[in-house]
Amino acid sequence: ITLKTGAYPMRELAMAIRWSSDADIDLLTIDGAPGGTGMSPWRMMTEWGIPAVYLHAMAYELCERLVKNGKRAPDLAFAGGFSSEDHVFKALALGAPYCKAVCMGRALMIPGMVGKNAERWLRDEDGGLPKTVSKFGFTKEEIFMNYEVLKAKYGEEVEDLPLGAVGLYNVVDKIKVGLQQLMAGSRNWKVGYISRDDIFSLSTE
């Protein structure tokens, strides 16, 4: 059982966390600005709600209070405009040990759509490959970094994979490898070892 909530003030966040604890749910996802939960359309996503870093810091403090009072803190997932491996690392560290996952929406939809468009362009639809893509190559193997990896894994079946899925795979692999590098550099050999000791603020604000 999971609940997803948006970039709301501390009172509402406290209610969501406490009620999730009381109901013994499996996961509470907290989507900070500029995330999309309850904040669409675009203008609201970019300008309304509590920014993710503040919202997620509040979530940590509220979970700490729950635990000190003998209550169970629910497992958390953080979301809110994340798009790269350093975002994932910092979110997990900021919410440790309560944050167990990081959610992404638009960051993964975009490569999926680019891959889907590339599939049409490679069939010479919509004017063919634009220069922004053709500078990387003119075939699937040249355009998609991990196409050969998928070919080695799936053999001839790779030809049936939608290029939107291939684009998504490329970005997820990039995030995975980047996160592994950050974890190795910080001496965290498992995701569960990432802690708040691994991050610090560069300014008092």
Where in the sequence are the language-model features?
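Glycine-rich phosphate/ribose-binding loops and adjacent secondary-structure elements
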Residues: 1-145
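C-terminal extensions of enzymes
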Residues: 110, 134-205
